[in-house]
């Protein structure tokens, strides 16, 4: 796409909405880290690092001091990104999505390297002492003496031997920003939090600028410690820039789906990237080819792909090695996974189709369900051969939703035609064992709510879970589907597999059945709406990583 004006805030808002499932309240954790920094960090050394960052020319010794300070801060923080390189294969992401991600990372790499003058971490050129002196003479020649600045201020230059040591040593952290404003500004932390909260509220509707900062400073004097200079590239988190303050303010807002509060975890990496690409294509976002500053999509993409675990925006990342394109790799060849070692004589035999790691992911997902909340359950297919399971908690929006390939394909086709509309070809790659793993992992004594409980109770008993109770709401078929169309209109993107044609069943004396496919998840949502009388204003959130739902089709061998 050719270069054009970027509607930055509109893109930011779109990304906030699209990634709202992965944003979290972080205010308490940020303040906790800020207190730890204040209690243990030597702020005399902090002042020296801030002085270094104001120098026009910085050397190897300056970089060493910055790295040492970053290491101390990292050790004090609980919110950090850890080194977790990711290899993405077809499965959770389609081949087209992998190709798109790979292309965007390559474009971003070229843009960053171009802006750095070919040397990673060194913006505006990595000039030697001789070149610096020569540049000074040339500036005098063209009328730009030492007292004459151009553009947005001084060009800061690093004159270091190994510029790769600069990677990931910059960028602000809200906990550090709050600590510096409190300790060095002589303010109470409560005043700082209040001031930054005001800045964060402005950020929910626009990018705060220096004029906004000046006006807010009248009500919150603590904000006067924020520099009035324009933000610069390669500036450390110890400098109290406006962008650092805005980031900290975003963390003080428990709401607004702020991108700054995203937390990455390996199981959810593909899900988050998939959501990002969907928003990108809907809003026609792109990676530009010119300029130093990153647009919102570029900024998000870089931060997410730098590490698959931790806080990409607000955590300490100074101990991470490599750049985003180094740490997130795309494997389009799909090499077969290594076969497990044979079971030794007398050793335990694992009959589960899931690996230990996959079972752990299911257990982690199920543990996020609250035993105290209303929990709906529904299946498609008979209890002995289910093809779909959904468990939904309407108060939080959390749900578990998975599929299973049927054993009895003939019976499945009849069920598809008259009920669920699932197609056999769409279930061939469904990962086996998920339904059993979910039921086994449910909390002891959990109460499940269902519309029609016979098949659910059979399924539960088949897994030996006599401790689980199933409550049947016993709605009539017609009453149960009062909210069917509104639910499908609103939540249709959650259901992508029920694409087959459904035919009405003809029963004497009964109203004609619906020709909408029966989706276990949609049914749970509409049954809850029928019981409560309204569709809840909560966004459903899948707890199972999408990588786990289906087998890697590139690893399948056709014999």
Swiss-Prot record:
Annotated positions for site Important for exonuclease activity: 455
Positions of Zn(2+) binding: 388, 495, 498, 519
E.C. code: 3.1.13.-
UniProt subcellular location: Virion; Host cytoplasm
Region spans: Binding site for the cap structure m7GTP: 53-235
Annotated Gene Ontology cellular component terms: helical viral capsid; host cell cytoplasm; ribonucleoprotein complex; viral nucleocapsid
InterPro entries: Nucleocapsid_arenaviridae, Nucleocapsid_C_arenaviridae, Nucleocapsid_C_sf, Nucleocapsid_N_arenaviridae
Taxonomy, superkingdom: Viruses
Binding site for Mn(2+): 378, 380, 523
Gene Ontology annotations of biological process type: negative stranded viral RNA replication; RNA-templated viral transcription; symbiont-mediated suppression of host cytoplasmic pattern recognition receptor signaling pathway via inhibition of IKBKE activity
MF (Gene Ontology): hydrolase activity; metal ion binding; RNA binding
Function noted in UniProt: Encapsidates the genome, protecting it from nucleases. The encapsidated genomic RNA is termed the nucleocapsid (NC). Serves as template for viral transcription and replication. The increased presence of protein N in host cell does not seem to trigger the switch from transcription to replication as observed in other negative strain RNA viruses.
Family as reported in the entry's similarity comment: Belongs to the arenaviridae nucleocapsid protein family.
Domain notes: The N-terminal region is important for the cap-binding activity while the C-terminal region contains the 3'-5' exoribonuclease activity. A CCHE zinc binding site is present in the C-terminal region and may thus contribute to the substrate binding and/or the specificity of the exonuclease activity.
Protein name, entry field: Nucleoprotein
Organism: Parana mammarenavirus (isolate Rat/Paraguay/12056/1965)
The organism's taxonomic lineage, starting at the top: Viruses, Riboviria, Orthornavirae, Negarnaviricota, Polyploviricotina
């Amino acid at each position: 796409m050719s270069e054009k004006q970027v509607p930055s805030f509109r893109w930011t808002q779109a990304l906030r909405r699209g990634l709202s499932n992965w944003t979290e309240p972080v205010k308490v954790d940020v303040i906790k880290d800020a207190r730890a920094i204040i209690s243990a960090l030597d702020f005399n050394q902090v002042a020296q690092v801030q002085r270094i960052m104001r120098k026009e020319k910085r050397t190897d010794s300056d970089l060493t001091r910055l790295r040492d300070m970053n290491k101390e801060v990292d050790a004090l923080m609980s919110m950090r990104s850890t080194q977790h390189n990711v290899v993405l294969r077809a499965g959770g992401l389609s081949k087209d999505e992998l190709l798109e991600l790979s292309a965007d990372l390559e474009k971003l790499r070229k843009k960053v390297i171009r802006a750095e003058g070919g040397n990673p971490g060194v913006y505006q050129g990595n000039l030697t002492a001789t070149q610096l002196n020569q540049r000074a003479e040339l500036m005098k020649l063209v009328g730009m003496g030492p007292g004459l600045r151009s553009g947005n201020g001084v060009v800061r230059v690093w004159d270091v031997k190994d510029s790769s040591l600069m990677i990931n040593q910059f960028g602000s952290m809200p906990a550090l920003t709050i600590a510096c404003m409190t300790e060095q500004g002589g303010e109470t932390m409560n005043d700082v939090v209040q001031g930054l909260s005001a800045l964060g509220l402005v950020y929910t509707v626009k990018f705060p600028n220096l004029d906004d900062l000046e006006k807010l400073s009248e009500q919150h004097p603590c904000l006067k410690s924020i520099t009035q200079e324009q933000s610069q590239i390669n500036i450390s988190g110890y400098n109290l820039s406006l962008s650092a303050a805005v980031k900290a303010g975003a963390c003080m807002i428990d709401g607004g789906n702020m991108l700054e509060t995203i937390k990455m975890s390996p199981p959810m990496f593909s899900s988050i990237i998939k959501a990002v690409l969907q928003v990108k294509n809907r809003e026609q976002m792109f990676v530009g080819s010119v300029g130093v500053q990153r647009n919102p999509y570029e900024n998000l993409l870089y931060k997410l792909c730098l590490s698959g675990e931790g806080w990409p925006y607000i955590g300490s990342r100074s101990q991470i090695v490599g750049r985003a394109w180094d740490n997130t790799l795309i494997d389009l060849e799909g090499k077969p996974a290594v076969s497990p070692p044979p079971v030794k004589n007398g050793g335990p035999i694992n009959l589960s189709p899931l690996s230990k790691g996959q079972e752990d992911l299911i257990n982690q997902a199920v543990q996020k369900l609250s035993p105290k909340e209303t929990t709906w359950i529904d299946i498609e297919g008979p209890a002995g051969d289910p093809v779909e399971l959904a468990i939904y908690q309407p108060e939080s929006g959390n749900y578990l939703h998975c599929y299973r390939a049927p054993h009895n394909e003939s019976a499945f086709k009849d069920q598809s035609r008259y009920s669920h509309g699932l197609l056999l070809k769409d279930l061939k790659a469904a990962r086996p064992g998920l339904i059993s793993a979910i039921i086994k992992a449910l909390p002891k004594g959990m109460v499940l709510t269902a519309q029609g409980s016979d098949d659910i109770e059979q399924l539960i008993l088949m897994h030996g879970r006599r401790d689980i109770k199933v409550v049947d709401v016993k709605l009539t078929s017609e009453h149960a589907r009062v909210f069917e169309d509104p639910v499908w209109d609103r939540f249709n993107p959650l259901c992508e597999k029920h694409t087959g044609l459904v035919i009405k069943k003809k029963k004497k004396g009964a109203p004609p059945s619906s020709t909408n496919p029966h989706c276990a998840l949609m049914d749970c949502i509409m049954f809850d709406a029928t019981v409560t009388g309204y569709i809840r204003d909560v966004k459903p959130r899948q707890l199972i990583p999408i990588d786990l739902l289906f087998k890697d089709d590139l690893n399948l061998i056709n014999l």
